């Protein structure tokens, strides 16, 4: 990494390779530090779009076990870390592919139990994850 990794590190200042390295290291952190096991005990695929594609920060597609991150929407390292942890959490949630839509209809997006859990996991672990990234990248 060219810059010191801090909360406010601008994602747009990083190369595609650096952004992917961060994404994979966050996956490693979730799996090995937080002990979160994704569906089938296999890492989900990771696709990072460097340019703006949507208004959301990321999404998880359960049918193909794919985490998509929209890096241009994640202005800072803090938002990027939150988003990757959040979407990785979805890859670990049982029945997410079956019940997600019905829960969204019943509770709404913001009160969907899958979303509540993913936001909580990201919020509780973002600081330690950023510290992990600083150590992993020698900063």
Language-model features: where?
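Charged phosphate-binding loop/patch that engages nucleotide di/tri-phosphates or the phosphate backbone
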Residues: 2-12, 18, 123-139
């Amino acid at each position: 990494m060219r810059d010191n990794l801090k909360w406010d590190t601008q994602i747009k200042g990083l190369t595609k390779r650096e952004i992917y390295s961060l994404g994979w290291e966050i996956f490693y952190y979730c799996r090995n530090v937080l002990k979160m096991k994704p569906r089938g005990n296999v890492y989900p695929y990771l696709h990072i779009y460097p340019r703006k594609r949507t208004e959301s920060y990321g999404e998880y597609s359960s049918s193909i076990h794919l985490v998509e991150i929209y890096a241009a929407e994640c202005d800072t390292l803090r938002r990027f870390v939150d988003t990757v942890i959040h979407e990785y959490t979805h890859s670990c949630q049982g029945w997410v592919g079956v019940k997600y839509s019905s829960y969204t209809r019943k509770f709404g997006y913001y009160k969907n139990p899958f979303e509540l859990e993913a936001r909580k996991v990201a919020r509780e672990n973002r600081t330690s994850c950023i510290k992990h990234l600083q150590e992993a990248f020698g900063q």
